[in-house]
Amino acid sequence: MSLGLQPNNDISSLVSSKNMTSENGLEHQFEELLVEKQYSEEHCAYCHIKNPNSILKCLHCNKWFCNVRGKSGASHIISHLVRARHKQVALHSHSSLSDTVLECYNCGTRNVFLLGFIPAKAKTVVVLLCRQPCARASIAKDMNWDLTQWQPIISDRQFLPWLITPPSEEEQKLAIPITSQQMVRLEELWRKDPNANLEDLDKPIEDDSLPSVELRYKDAHAYQAVLSPLIQAEADYDKRLKESQTQKDVVVRWDQAINKRYTAWFLLPKLESGEIRLAIGDEMKLTYEGELRAPWSSTGYVIKIPNNVSDEVGLELKRSDKVPIECTHNFSVDYVWKSTSFDRMQTALRLFATDGSRLSSFLYHKLLGHDIPPSFLKPKLPSDLSVPNLPKLNASQSEAVRAVLSKPLSLIQGPPGTGKTVTSASVVYHLATMQSRKRKSHSPVLVCAPSNVAVDQLAEKIHRTGLRVVRVAAKSREDIESSVSFLSLHEQIKNYKFNPELQRLLKLRSENNELSIQDEKKLRILVAAAEKELLRAAHVICCTCVGAGDRRISKYKFRSVLIDEATQASEPECMIPLVLGAKQVVLVGDHQQLGPVVMNKKVALASLSQSLFERLIILGNSPFRLVVQYRMHPCLSEFPSNTFYEGTLQNGVTTSERIARHVDFPWIQPDSPLMFYANFGQEELSASGTSFLNRTEASTCEKIVTTFLRSNVLPEQIGIVTPYDGQRSYIVQYMQNNGSMQKDLYKAVEVASVDAFQGREKDFIILSCVRSSEHQGIGFVNDPRRLNVALTRAKYGVIVLGNPKVLAKHALWYHFVLHCKEKGYLVEGTLNSLQKFSLTLTPPQKPQKFKRDLNVQRSLSPIQNAGSAMLPSFSNLPNLYSSSYLEEWNVFAQYKRRESNATDFEDFRSQVGDDESKFDEPTRF
């Protein structure tokens, strides 16, 4: 409550008071007034609760917040810290613990998301210690502390009540009510004006609404009018994010490579906490800010990112002159934001809208969603479509290849382990063979994918067939080794023997690390000519979707285009290769696995996270599905097949072929290597405050990995998958600190996100679900596509670690836990004495609002008329498995994206279980 008077008026009233006759009395009352005034302003910035025992001060912005749990499930102080990315707090001076700054007793860190407590020797005293490294037994051993009692000071996204008392019910009734949307809006206002308050929420909001992706468009101009603003919004967001990530006081060590270029090695604390993302080939700027020498800065490309072996980042500098290798401290690191990918998307949209020759008429209308008669090609195909040096095609693969070669637009759906890459390579082989017969109109086949890894994998397979393949990589990646480096354009130029002068200049530059201005100009001309010859002679050109906008490629026209992993590419990404003259297009992917990554939540809400592959399916373009899987033990494929693919997957491997009999592991059923291992550890917020970890599951991971290693399983055969970066980082550290085997063995075990494992496989997979709160949602774990990817990476065995009681409250996981229970895979106990876990399961009830919105969307959506094998009518869906849930989730997501505005995003995500995704990693649908 405020005093209701302005400060000047308060002082005037004191001075004019007849009762204040002594100077001491005046000073005393003046001080009391100032204290009262200050006290009245120290209230929760969200709801105005001001009980000193219930509020904390954010030391970053100096605002106060209470410990009451809001509608979002988190207390107001935690909601603020997470949204604002702040981490330090202090108690109120009038609280029972005084104005204490919460920090680690041992190292002084003030990151509250790292802090926990243990009882000290005195029973009435507790000690605050950070989770790592200070709560490790080796550090606290000498202090006689029982570290097994360490608990985080934040539980269920609320400070523990003995530390910060939650407001009473009476205080909460008097508090100003505030919704999650209003809190989000207030945080946005504070970024622009730190003095904004609740009254500012009533002011008119700037219209920053974005158009939503549509199913159909009148013409290409309308298409551009919708997608162009979304690309720009995503670019602006990415730019702000990258440019705000300057890191000071970086310590550097130096190394010089054979090419005489210097590499700077350093740690990035923000990277460790999950605040920023980094990829090979990213450009960064390194600046020296010390006093030992003159100011210096240089840019370079990232050649190494943190992994299980080392947390260091490697930055290879572009130039090697005047590098301060004698200095190691006082450096800063900045991201160098590049607009290249966004510019190329915008260019593709512009060309699509203004140049009618960029696509065939048929493809133009199909991409816009127009109803036009089907079109068929009449290629001369052999009876056996298998190709040289690749496995013989099975029936579904052969049918898919034959069908797509006779159509100008085709979709191939490749569920996990079904030989999608072999099928794609076979399609490309026949497309290239047909093109080579047309000598006058010969053009290479353009093969693209959204990621470099996917491009490399497909390029390697195509090369095996005997075709001439050229892999075009970005200039920033030319020095990065890959399995297909010998196919890269720049490597082929180095070995281009038809121009001795070119070879002489390349050798001279390699030896001297530079050329004269005249020789440099001459070399550029010779390289361009050689590139032209190599590209013209190629049967197949491989690059990323964004790479197709490279000037070396974009000046050519490509009649045939194949895009692999098309469901992971945004629609504008796909348009970059398509507008290079496409007349025949093949999109390959699986829309039941992970979709495109979109950083900006508002852009994701506008459906830019929907791939072109998905939109075409909704429009009625049925994909050709590959149905024989060659990866998983049959017991591992059963649930994914029934849940995500209507039971259509067939096993191309037998049980005996997928039993690792030499591995001594306590499977509850030796011939069925699938296990849901019940773990009931507490979930905790990670150091970033935006991700989660579970120490119990991390400990179990280490025990399982150690058991495998003792059974002579190679560490490279084991993969640990988790949806949360906080858990990934903690597992890596935990195995290093607590594993009983050699540390190098644990370093070689890959621990990564679900996203990082898509398209890959391991012999054994451990899935750590992390989420275990009775009061919160289960977040990313509830995404059907993530579960599908996680369960389908292993060949010989899967172990799922999680809390079945919590997970089974959600429809998708209810069916998986039920499946495991009925099959006898649900277990509990120690690893050397596992037993079946008896659990009573009750089918979860969907919220009525979910059902109501779903019914509305069913009446509106064209999905039910799509005619796709992947989208059956709702009435015919199986009851036992969660296919219905998967389709409902997707339909509901589409409906909410189209019908909601940006402020509805939190409620939308919470209804589908991802209530904290607004704080976590980028949106990936």
UniProtKB/Swiss-Prot annotation:
What EC number is given for this enzyme?
3.6.4.12, 3.6.4.13
Query: Region (CC/SHH/C): which ranges?
Result: 58-86
Listed as disulfide-bonded, the cysteine pairs are none
What are the protein's GO molecular function terms? ATP binding; ATP hydrolysis activity; double-stranded DNA helicase activity; RNA binding; RNA helicase activity; single-stranded DNA binding; zinc ion binding
Task: List every stretch annotated C4.
Answer: 104-134
- Where Zn(2+) 1 binds, per the record, is at C44, C47, C66, H76
Q: Where is the composition biased (Basic and acidic residues)?
A: 915-925
The entry marks the following residues as binding ATP, namely Q397, G417, T418, G419, K420, T421, Q593, Y630, E761
Q: Does the keyword section mention Transmembrane helix?
A: no
Region of interest: Disordered: 906-925
Q: Which SMART domains match?
A: AAA
Any idea which UniProt keywords this protein has? ATP-binding, Cytoplasm, Helicase, Hydrolase, Metal-binding, Nonsense-mediated mRNA decay, Nucleotide-binding, Zinc, Zinc-finger
- A GO cellular-component term linked to this record: cytosol
Which enzyme class, named as a word? Answer: hydrolase
Give me the residues that bind Zn(2+) 3, please: C104, C107, C130, C134
What does the UniProt entry say about where the protein is found?
Cytoplasm
Q: InterPro entries recorded for this chain?
A: AAA+_ATPase, DNA2/NAM7-like, DNA2/NAM7-like_C, DNA2/NAM7_AAA_11, Helicase/UvrB_N, P-loop_NTPase, SF1_C_Upf1, UPF1_1B_dom
Q: Which family does it belong to?
A: Belongs to the DNA2/NAM7 helicase family.
> Function, please?
RNA-dependent helicase required for nonsense-mediated decay (NMD) of aberrant mRNAs containing premature stop codons and modulates the expression level of normal mRNAs. Also capable of unwinding double-stranded DNA and translocating on single-stranded DNA.
Q: What is this protein called?
A: ATP-dependent helicase upf1
Q: Which organism is it from?
A: Schizosaccharomyces pombe (strain 972 / ATCC 24843) (Fission yeast)
Q: Which gene encodes it?
A: upf1
